[in-house]
């Protein structure tokens, strides 16, 4: 298994590309990205945790969640689902938000693709930023390191999953 993630920044297109493989079946990986009770187990870099206030995984639906720091600090975000093809692809608009669910623009458009490779699953993520400045600020704030740590949480969770 490859423990690394391919993380590429393309300033010309204002996109970030992340490619990874997980030693888990596609259903388990899909569920990890689309079910709030599973997302909250891995979707934050330690020692932070994820707390979903509500999630409606359907086109036009939203996930409203916070990343909660060890001191109780809450950083809220909202994801608005724009396209879903089960176990293949989903897309959403992501933006930081206040505690009342008001997005703080600009945001970014995420496109996640899932490929069944038998006993493993490939996930390709493309993140389009509305402005180069937003993308550069996101990278400067430690997005690569934070999201890589978050994906390592997912990998560890999937590897320790008990079938059934």
Feature roles, as predicted:
Residues 13-19, 26, 62, 76, ...:
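Intrinsic-disorder/low-complexity, polar/charged segments enriched in Ser/Thr/Lys/Arg/Asp/Glu/Gln
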Residues 17, 37-74:
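Short beta-edge strand/loop motif at the mouth of beta-sheet-based domains
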Residues 18-20, 52-53, 77-83, 108-115:
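Hydrophobic/aromatic beta-strand elements that line small-molecule binding cavities or substrate pockets
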Residues 29, 39, 63, 81, ...:
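Hydrophobic pocket/interface hotspot
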Residues 99-145:
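Beta-strand/loop substructures that line and gate deep hydrophobic ligand-binding cavities in soluble
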Residues 158-164:
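Short, highly charged C-terminal tails/helix-capping segments
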